[in-house]
């Protein structure tokens, strides 16, 4: 890194700030949801669309971001991503209704979807191959710090200012980043194949419509007949994509990916696994504030042990998988995460608040081990010519499954809860207890998929390399 030219180091700093902005925004919002609900006149149990709108937009836009960067240029797309993200943040802060906030989060998600993959592509183009790993480690470190700072920073801003400031802090950073991008970043372009617009639109419609339908009649305000039509529309769109992609070399995601058995198992397990674990970052701060009466600041602080456990486990996950094999690790961590989530609820209901940080630290460790194992299992056996496409599909599935997880969490809260519940009341405890039981079951179910993973026949020599490609 030290022998790189000054201009290249500045370009890496720009990419690193983009990673930081995007990752910070994934966790800073969760702590503020109850305060947002109070300000907007909504029930805290119905605020999940603030999270879903952002994550789902990222999932939908991810497949197009790399192609746009190659076609239009990395500087132009990265600048556009920062501008859209910053404008989305401004509109979020100006929002006076939940619908306005959701629309602003969609705009923010479009920028966020382009920021990280285009940033990775930028590093690939400006750094020599032998220094690529060191450069990626440098630019992704702020992305790991963002989730750590997000909950606590969100809690501080909500408690001592207002929820609007969790979005307003993005604006000066975004302005500086946009100016620096125009001044310092070269506009690399590449020859690209024709973009599969038909496949992109079919997948986008299918993902968005099915996620909306999951929100139910209470969330969408639609009749059961209209919801049924949405489901049919989503299924039809996915079916049409499968027909479109069959024997199509220009398809957005080739169906040849699924000829690799471990990819099929890993992708289905990753989808099901992240539906369950995607509920936890949303549910935990909401439960701490609405269920236990914690302040936003203290709820944010309680999330830090979970992130610390996750970051700490990344250092030894390679050895764990090589020692015990994928099947044992994935089945054990899936069932373990379900048990730890039940332990968290039990400790909270018993009033042993001093033990909650330890439980959350353990939850972070188990979750991190499972995530890394799922990622590498999915990609490790793909042929080189399909590795990039497989990685893109996995990234999209990761975002989609998390949005579905948050949607299901909101659906469960709405099903068990009333329109408005008082903080730290018996009614709220009952609502969260039933929701947590359902969530623990959903978290455990992917163990049935991972039990089908074949026994490892050799030590995994590529887990470390593949794991970094999915960070």
Swiss-Prot record:
Query: Which residues are listed as membrane-spanning?
Result: 12-32, 49-69, 77-97, 102-124, 138-158, 165-185, 197-217, 222-242, 263-283, 286-306, 342-362, 396-416, 431-451
- The superkingdom of the source organism is Bacteria
Which Pfam family name is an example for this entry? MFS_1
Q: Which PROSITE patterns match?
A: MFS
Keyword check for Transport, yes or no: yes
Q: Where does it primarily localize?
A: membrane
What's this protein's family per the entry?
Belongs to the major facilitator superfamily. TCR/Tet family.
Q: What is the name of the gene encoding this protein? A: mdtD
The UniProt keyword set, sorted, is: Cell inner membrane, Cell membrane, Membrane, Transmembrane, Transmembrane helix, Transport
Q: What is this protein called?
A: Putative multidrug resistance protein MdtD
Q: Which PANTHER family match?
A: BLR6921 PROTEIN (PTHR42718:SF46), MAJOR FACILITATOR SUPERFAMILY MULTIDRUG TRANSPORTER MFSC (PTHR42718)
Topology of this chain in the membrane: Multi-pass membrane protein
Q: Which organism is it from?
A: Citrobacter koseri (strain ATCC BAA-895 / CDC 4225-83 / SGSC4696)
Choose one Gene Ontology CC annotation of this protein and give it: plasma membrane
């Amino acid at each position: 890194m030290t022998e790189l030219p000054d201009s290249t180091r500045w370009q890496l700093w720009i990419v690193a700030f983009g990673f930081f902005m995007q990752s910070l925004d994934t966790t800073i919002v969760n702590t503020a949801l109850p305060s947002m609900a109070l300000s907007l006149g909504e029930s805290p149990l119905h605020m999940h669309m603030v999270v879903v709108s952002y994550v789902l937009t990222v999932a939908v836009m991810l497949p197009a971001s790399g192609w746009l960067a190659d076609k239009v240029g990395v500087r132009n797309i990265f600048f556009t991503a920062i501008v859209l993200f910053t404008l989305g943040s401004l509109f979020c802060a100006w929002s006076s209704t939940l619908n306005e906030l959701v629309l602003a989060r969609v705009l923010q998600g479009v920028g966020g979807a382009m920021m990280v993959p285009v940033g990775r592509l930028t590093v690939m183009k400006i750094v020599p191959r032998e220094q690529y790993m060191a450069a990626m480690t440098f630019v992704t470190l702020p992305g790991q710090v963002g989730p750590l700072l997000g909950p606590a920073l969100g809690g501080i801003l909500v408690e001592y200012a207002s929820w609007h400031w969790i979005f307003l802090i993005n604006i000066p950073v975004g302005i500086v980043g946009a100016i620096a991008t125009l001044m310092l970043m070269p506009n690399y372009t590449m020859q690209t194949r024709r973009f599969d617009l038909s496949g992109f639109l079919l997948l986008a419609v299918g993902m968005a419509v099915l996620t909306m339908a999951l929100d139910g009649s209470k969330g969408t305000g639609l009749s059961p007949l209209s919801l049924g039509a949405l489901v049919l529309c989503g299924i039809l769109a996915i079916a049409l994509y499968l027909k479109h992609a069959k024997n199509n070399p220009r398809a957005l995601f080739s169906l040849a990916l699924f000829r690799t058995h471990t990819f099929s198992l890993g992708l289905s397990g990753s989808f099901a696994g992240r539906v369950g674990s995607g509920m936890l970052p949303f549910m935990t701060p909401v439960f701490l504030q609405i269920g236990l009466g914690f302040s936003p600041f203290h709820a944010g602080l309680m999330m830090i042990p979970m992130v610390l456990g996750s970051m700490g486990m990344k250092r030894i996950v390679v050895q764990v998988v090589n020692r015990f094999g994928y099947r044992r690790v994935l089945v054990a961590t899936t069932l373990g995460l379900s048990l730890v989530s039940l332990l968290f609820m039990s400790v909270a209901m018993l009033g042993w608040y001093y033990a909650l940080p330890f439980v959350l630290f353990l939850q972070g460790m188990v979750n991190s081990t499972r995530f890394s194992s799922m990622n590498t299992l999915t990609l490790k056996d793909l042929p080189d010519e399909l590795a990039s496409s497989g990685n893109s599909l996995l990234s999209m599935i990761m975002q989609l499954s998390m949005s579905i997880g948050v949607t299901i969490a909101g659906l469960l809260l709405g099903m068990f809860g009333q329109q408005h519940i008082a903080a730290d009341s018996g009614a709220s405890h009952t609502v969260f207890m039933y929701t947590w039981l359902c969530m623990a079951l959903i978290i455990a179910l992917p163990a049935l998929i991972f039990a089908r993973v074949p026994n490892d026949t050799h030590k995994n020599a590529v887990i470390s390399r593949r794991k970094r490609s999915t960070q």
